[in-house]
């Protein structure tokens, strides 16, 4: 293949493409390295692509002081960088070779063993430890991240090597709980991890993320479900984790704290099943000036909006906030429903049509105009901002309806 073009043409092709993989296909191409302008670190590229034979050849040229090495300098710093990346990517054969060339496994505060632990590469960790890596560097980063990412075998190995599972205020068990790694959580607790640190962080965030089995286990170990003003049930509701909410309530969680935070956030995020359940427990859907209906409307959750209205929510609260922000965010079906329930689209100097225009919501704008919205309110705010934001179709429509677009 090399012979089909002149070397200078190959150089131009490689410089134009920025790709050096062709240079690694045979020795003839490899000789072109000194002629190209690419800034690619050759060693790093070779390691990234797991080309150990190419790496060995490259190092051989260095030992022979081949002219090509005048441009491609191999330093300990570059070897260390490649070692760390190889540990992250589980390239044990290249790791061993880099170490044989002088790469420092402890470079960057033992970054290599930390990243191998974080990414679940047990054999790499064992090799690095055999070479003297410090698993406790950076406040036991290795065991913390192995726990956080659910690598039980690595956690056990690091513990056998002296890792402190309670480092950084029991970070390991807190994040294993938050990320849903039950086996890791149980193992850490069996070794004395404190599940109640940071104001019961573990159960709060396990609840927030919907890990029912972990929540149940933490409760069995003495976690306080009501910590931090019933944060657990509030965040479980906010994220729609019905089973977790139901369980926390069965354990005594108070759904009404913080001005009915639970039902407000469940409504805001569109979790109808949770909303209905909380209402069945006497949650106040009208708390905080009808926050629930306002934000479910603003976020476009039509079924939640309908349910809240059926339960007595005031769609006109705070100067028709619901229809104004449903319009602003382009939720046409919600806007139509609210209008059908008596919402006033013209409140706030025709806020709804002005901000629907500004936000580029053409269908909402058309509907509001059809319902009698004044597109010229606030000195033709609607067309000015539609123009400013680049919404050409809205500008055309508004002008066709009598809006006046003036030059500043």
Curated annotation (Swiss-Prot):
Pfam families attached to this UniProt entry: Ank (PF00023), Ank_2 (PF12796), Ank_4 (PF13637)
Which SMART domains does the UniProt record give? ANK (SM00248)
The signal sequence is none
What InterPro entries has UniProt attached to this entry? Ankyrin_rpt, Ankyrin_rpt-contain_sf
Disulfide bond sites: none
Listed A to Z, the keywords are: ANK repeat, Repeat
- ANK repeats span 78-107, 108-137, 139-167, 168-197, 198-227, 229-257, 259-287, 288-317, 318-347, 349-377, 378-407
Protein name per the record: Putative ankyrin repeat protein L483
